[in-house]
Amino acid sequence: MKRRSAIKFALHASLVGFPALGLFALPAGAATATSSFAVTATVASTCLVSATSLGFGSYTGLVVPALSTVSVTCTNTTPYNVGLSAGLGTGATVTTRKMTGPASALLAYGLFQDAGHTLNWGVTAGTDTVAGTGNGATQPITVYGQIPTAQYVAPGAYADTITVTVTY
């Protein structure tokens, strides 16, 4: 009886257990195949620009300076030029901008590239704009404003709008 049980166990193991092991084993001489693919991208030159308001405060006939900041963010190594428009005041130019006040009164002012108020800021690249090269980070550029002396205008609020243009 013992012999019969041993034969029965051996037969059962060969039919059930051991053939299953063959399902998980790799056949002798297994091969692999490989391939490759290209990965590409194009980075376009781009720039973003924003600016803070320039507030002169109260004007009493004396020189009034003020500052604004133009923030330029361009892709790395992208050359750019920042220009400032003449504004919306009647008869304004980039050398003499004009804020409009009560009854269409005009108050002249200037925008400059330097603290000494000697380098006018206009719109002609290579002449009166500010040039730079993008580095991927925001680059702040100071705008120096000034109202000249001895303008005798009506009291009230004066305003203008300047358009900042970044050419790249």
Predicted ranges, named:
Residues 114-138:
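Extracellular beta-sheet repeat scaffolds used for adhesion and glycan interaction
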Residues 16-28:
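C-terminal segment of classical bacterial N-terminal signal peptides
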Residues 105:
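Solvent-exposed beta-hairpin/edge-strand motifs
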